[in-house]
UniProtKB/Swiss-Prot annotation:
Pfam families: Arg_repressor (PF01316), Arg_repressor_C (PF02863). Keywords: Amino-acid biosynthesis, Arginine biosynthesis, Cytoplasm, DNA-binding, Repressor, Transcription, Transcription regulation. This is Arginine repressor. The gene is argR. It is found in: Cytoplasm. Belongs to the ArgR family.
Length: 147
């Protein structure tokens, strides 16, 4: 098995079954499985798969985001509101970063950027004059995933 395939499989197994609170802990678990890797490689992989940290009894743990096939986004998005300068999306805890990444990729031409916390996303459109349209486009985009 190629190293990247083995690494992907092991990382998914660690996050889905055991969990880990730090990248160093993930490296240690990989090492115990005979897979040598660096913290920077783990960091890049976590970013690539949009891993999120979920609060729990033992502290925050890395987790894979729900797949679009497994869970519709409409259950993760609670509200989309805007004023004259900002769009605010409230999400389920731990999903804001993943959803913000989807929005960043889809709406790069119409937004300046997103800022995601644990359960809230702030979106700044390029122009205030199109904020209502941008908010509606984002809402329609997110609904596509929930049908």
């Amino acid at each position: 098995m190629k190293k990247n395939v083995a690494l992907d499989k092991a990382l998914k197994e660690i996050l889905n079954e055991e969990g880990a609170s730090t990248q160093e802990e993930i490296c240690e678990k990989l090492s115990s499985l005979g897979i040598a890797t660096t913290q920077s490689s783990v960091s890049r992989w976590l970013k690539k798969v949009h891993a999120i940290k979920i609060p729990g009894d033992k502290g925050a743990r890395y987790s894979l985001p729900p797949s679009i096939d497994d869970s519709s986004i409409k259950h993760l998005v609670f509200s989309i509101r805007h004023n004259s300068s900002l769009i605010v999306i409230r999400t389920a805890p731990g999903s804001a970063s993943w959803i913000a990444s989807l929005i960043d990729n889809k709406f790069a031409e119409s937004i300046l950027g997103t800022l995601a916390g644990d359960d809230t996303i702030f979106i700044t459109p390029i122009t205030e004059s199109t904020i209502s349209l941008t908010a509606k486009d984002i809402e329609n985009f997110l609904l596509v995933f929930s049908e």
